[in-house]
């Protein structure tokens, strides 16, 4: 009898990396993961990765989003262990991606080709579970609830995810590559292809050369962009960027008395056709906007402004035709578009291997935080069973 049939409908005891206090190392503890309820699936995590969003919430020590204890992690791949009632389209053994961005497949926006903003669910990122509010599926050794993280919580051997946040994928794709498609790569590629719709011969500038920014570069490279300018303070990112088609580099620390946008405009005659802000700083969003050409320049904001600061845009610049828009998850509908990305990878159209710079065991998860925080990794794969 396999383990799935033994554990189905019962709590599972497993290891999880728990954040008990802001900024402190995660603690690997034994926890209990309850069985899935209606519309939920319990997943065995195969591997997970670390995103800057995880680091942001790891440091967060106040406000409604700061909750302890908590299981972080949202970029991962797993296998279905068991399903709850009213679950269609998933079965034991399916390879799946848990995704923080929901798709209910019923609301006006999910049905429309114009947006990926699920109006049924996307406004709530405070709950533990999508349909059951603050009810948690995790308990520590003392029987106390552990908070979920943006409906995924992948820093655990098992997790429970609502079907609105779950995508079934082909088992042919390597699982480490698949994990990247659940957040960073999908966000960058989607922004380049679906939101910006970059044309051949375009000039592009990308602010921030982390995994999202490099995925943008890969996307515009495949669209035939003629000039791809990367902006980053870390000179090591420049060599990595070349593998994704970046042709020119700007280090803000070396711009002297000029602003970044002034340097970009000089490099591109009057400005870039497309500008992508992948960091999440209001000041850089403004610089990204000023870096684009009058008449048709388009700025896409992918980074989340951590302090929710406003940005200031010149009304005359808007009148002259420059535009700016934001995007969550690159404008992609997870259930519809992620399988397409998987297929393009399997057809060898996408270079994603170079995004993985480190691999660690689950017990080494705190090292992954330090590598990313210090700018020494792009993506670190954390293996649950190695």
Curated annotation (Swiss-Prot):
<feature type="binding site">
    <location>
        <position position="110"/>
    </location>
    <ligand>
        <name>Zn(2+) 2</name>
    </ligand>
</feature>
<comment type="similarity">
    <text>Belongs to the zinc-containing alcohol dehydrogenase family. Class-III subfamily.</text>
</comment>
<dbReference type="GO" id="GO:0008270">
    <property type="term" value="F:zinc ion binding"/>
</dbReference>
<feature type="binding site">
    <location>
        <position position="379"/>
    </location>
    <ligand>
        <name>NAD(+)</name>
    </ligand>
</feature>
<dbReference type="InterPro" id="IPR036291">
    <property type="entry name" value="NAD(P)-bd_dom_sf"/>
</dbReference>
<dbReference type="Pfam" id="PF00107">
    <property type="entry name" value="ADH_zinc_N"/>
</dbReference>
<dbReference type="GO" id="GO:0005737">
    <property type="term" value="C:cytoplasm"/>
</dbReference>
<feature type="binding site">
    <location>
        <position position="237"/>
    </location>
    <ligand>
        <name>NAD(+)</name>
    </ligand>
</feature>
<comment type="subunit">
    <text>Homodimer.</text>
</comment>
<dbReference type="InterPro" id="IPR002328">
    <property type="entry name" value="ADH_Zn_CS"/>
</dbReference>
<feature type="binding site">
    <location>
        <position position="53"/>
    </location>
    <ligand>
        <name>NAD(+)</name>
    </ligand>
</feature>
<keyword id="KW-0560">Oxidoreductase</keyword>
<feature type="binding site">
    <location>
        <position position="232"/>
    </location>
    <ligand>
        <name>NAD(+)</name>
    </ligand>
</feature>
<feature type="binding site">
    <location>
        <position position="51"/>
    </location>
    <ligand>
        <name>Zn(2+) 1</name>
    </ligand>
</feature>
<keyword id="KW-0520">NAD</keyword>
<dbReference type="Pfam" id="PF08240">
    <property type="entry name" value="ADH_N"/>
</dbReference>
<keyword id="KW-0479">Metal-binding</keyword>
<dbReference type="GO" id="GO:0004022">
    <property type="term" value="F:alcohol dehydrogenase (NAD+) activity"/>
</dbReference>
<feature type="binding site">
    <location>
        <position position="118"/>
    </location>
    <ligand>
        <name>Zn(2+) 2</name>
    </ligand>
</feature>
<protein>
    <recommendedName>
        <fullName>Alcohol dehydrogenase-like 2</fullName>
        <ecNumber>1.1.1.1</ecNumber>
    </recommendedName>
</protein>
<feature type="binding site">
    <location>
        <begin position="302"/>
        <end position="304"/>
    </location>
    <ligand>
        <name>NAD(+)</name>
    </ligand>
</feature>
<feature type="binding site">
    <location>
        <position position="53"/>
    </location>
    <ligand>
        <name>an alcohol</name>
    </ligand>
</feature>
<dbReference type="InterPro" id="IPR013149">
    <property type="entry name" value="ADH-like_C"/>
</dbReference>
<feature type="binding site">
    <location>
        <position position="74"/>
    </location>
    <ligand>
        <name>Zn(2+) 1</name>
    </ligand>
</feature>
<feature type="binding site">
    <location>
        <position position="183"/>
    </location>
    <ligand>
        <name>Zn(2+) 1</name>
    </ligand>
</feature>
<keyword id="KW-0862">Zinc</keyword>
<feature type="binding site">
    <location>
        <position position="74"/>
    </location>
    <ligand>
        <name>an alcohol</name>
    </ligand>
</feature>
<dbReference type="InterPro" id="IPR011032">
    <property type="entry name" value="GroES-like_sf"/>
</dbReference>
<feature type="binding site">
    <location>
        <position position="329"/>
    </location>
    <ligand>
        <name>NAD(+)</name>
    </ligand>
</feature>
<feature type="binding site">
    <location>
        <position position="104"/>
    </location>
    <ligand>
        <name>Zn(2+) 2</name>
    </ligand>
</feature>
<keyword id="KW-0963">Cytoplasm</keyword>
<dbReference type="InterPro" id="IPR013154">
    <property type="entry name" value="ADH-like_N"/>
</dbReference>
<feature type="binding site">
    <location>
        <begin position="208"/>
        <end position="213"/>
    </location>
    <ligand>
        <name>NAD(+)</name>
    </ligand>
</feature>
<feature type="binding site">
    <location>
        <position position="53"/>
    </location>
    <ligand>
        <name>Zn(2+) 1</name>
    </ligand>
</feature>
<feature type="binding site">
    <location>
        <position position="107"/>
    </location>
    <ligand>
        <name>Zn(2+) 2</name>
    </ligand>
</feature>
